[in-house]
């Protein structure tokens, strides 16, 4: 087998594995979120379907597959139909340039757990994950429903604003490391616990986490949905499998975001003491992923004006200040 054929086959297998694993993890995350929220609210959560309620995932999947798929008669039908697909595709494509685990040897071949190790991986991931919002905007606009349009418009304003915050935070990381490659950023933090970038860029870490909550539409910074104001927002008219595609795309983006935070700030998949790197990667990513649930349970929903004022009056000035300080530190 030629090197190109082996590379193509390896990339195809990796793509299939990533889609299968992360689609399954997205479903498992819904169960985890229910259990965590139930614990915070002194409830039991899912416990009737299967042991510890684990088969609830299968029940939900059957419901989504068998529920009637309704397309409103006054909607832009083609755009309405493909918007959920855009959400899921963009979320999974963004995973292609993210190194998941340390490299390992299989049948004499060195395998890198990454589909494409490109030298601008950080730009690729941020760009493709940002495209997920086109699905939200197009779905809300095509629904021809006032609640959907309001949710899409609110989300559009927020994502444009907070993408700037996240980008400015990441530029500081790139200035320190000198590379857009996520593998290089991971290797930069390989000298031990105190080489983690969270200690060198604590403000960038906080800014990026806040921007991540906006990009993944998570409480308390979610503007696209609000039961008391705009019902289900962009997803008001969606049902069945199409709604499920939005759901899978959102949770896949959350998982990708948690892995990205681990790679950028928490030492990535470097080993820690006697703990292997792959275990560290899973533990740290799971901890960041837990923050999504904790924030939803602990904090109230912010008003749109509060979210936007926080962005332009506090976060962007802080991001610019952090960038200037980092530039001075690099020059000196």
Swiss-Prot record:
Q: What is its EC number?
A: 7.1.1.-
Q: What is its main location?
A: membrane
Membrane-spanning residues: 4-24, 44-64, 78-98, 120-140, 165-185, 194-214, 255-275, 279-299, 312-332
**According to its UniProt record, which reaction does this protein catalyse?**
a quinone + NADH + 5 H(+)(in) = a quinol + NAD(+) + 4 H(+)(out)
Q: Which UniProt keywords apply?
A: Cell inner membrane, Cell membrane, Membrane, NAD, Quinone, Translocase, Transmembrane, Transmembrane helix, Ubiquinone
A GO BP entry? aerobic respiration
Instruction: Identify the domain of life.
Output: Bacteria
GO molecular function annotations of the record = NADH dehydrogenase activity; oxidoreductase activity, acting on NAD(P)H, quinone or similar compound as acceptor; quinone binding
Key word Translocase present: yes
Q: Where in the cell is it found?
A: Cell inner membrane
GO cellular component, as recorded: plasma membrane
The record describes its membrane topology as: Multi-pass membrane protein
Q: Where is the signal peptide?
A: none
Q: Which NCBIfam families match?
A: PRK06076.1-2
Spell out the subunit comment.
Answer: NDH-1 is composed of 14 different subunits. Subunits NuoA, H, J, K, L, M, N constitute the membrane sector of the complex.
Record-stated family: Belongs to the complex I subunit 1 family.
Q: Which HAMAP family does this entry report, sorted A to Z? A: NDH1_NuoH
- What's the protein here called? NADH-quinone oxidoreductase subunit H
């Amino acid at each position: 087998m030629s090197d190109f054929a082996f590379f193509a086959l390896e990339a195809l297998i990796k793509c299939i594995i990533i889609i299968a694993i992360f689609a399954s993890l997205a479903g498992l995350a819904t169960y985890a979120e229910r259990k965590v929220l139930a614990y915070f609210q002194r409830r039991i959560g899912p416990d009737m379907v299967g042991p510890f309620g684990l088969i609830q995932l299968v029940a939900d999947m059957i419901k989504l597959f068998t529920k009637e798929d309704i397309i409103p008669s006054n909607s832009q039908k083609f755009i309405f139909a493909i918007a959920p697909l855009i959400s899921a595709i963009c979320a999974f494509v963004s995973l292609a340039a993210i190194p998941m685990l340390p490299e390992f040897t299989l049948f004499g071949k060195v395998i890198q757990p990454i589909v494409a190790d490109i030298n601008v991986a950080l730009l690729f991931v941020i760009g493709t994950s940002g495209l997920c919002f086109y699905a939200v905007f197009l779905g809300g606009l095509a629904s021809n429903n006032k609640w959907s349009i309001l949710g899409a418009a609110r989300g559009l304003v927020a994502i444009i604003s907070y993408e700037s915050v996240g980008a400015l935070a990441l530029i500081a990381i790139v200035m320190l490391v000198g590379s857009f490659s996520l593998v290089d950023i991971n290797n930069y933090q390989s000298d031990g616990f105190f080489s983690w970038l969270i200690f060198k860029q604590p403000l960038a870490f906080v800014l990026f986490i806040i921007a991540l909550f906006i990009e993944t539409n998570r409480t308390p910074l979610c503007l696209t949905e609000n039961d008391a104001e705009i019902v289900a927002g962009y997803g008001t008219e969606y049902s069945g499998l199409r709604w499920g595609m939005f759901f899978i795309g959102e949770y896949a983006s959350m998982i990708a975001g948690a892995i990205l935070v681990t790679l950028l700030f928490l030492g990535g998949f470097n080993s820690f003491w006697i703990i292997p790197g792959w275990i560290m990667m899973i533990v740290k990513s799971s901890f960041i992923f837990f923050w999504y649930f904790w924030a939803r349970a602990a904090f109230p929903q912010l008003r749109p004006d509060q979210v936007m004022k926080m962005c332009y009056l506090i976060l962007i000035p802080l991001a610019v200040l952090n960038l200037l300080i980092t530039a001075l530190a690099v020059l000196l």
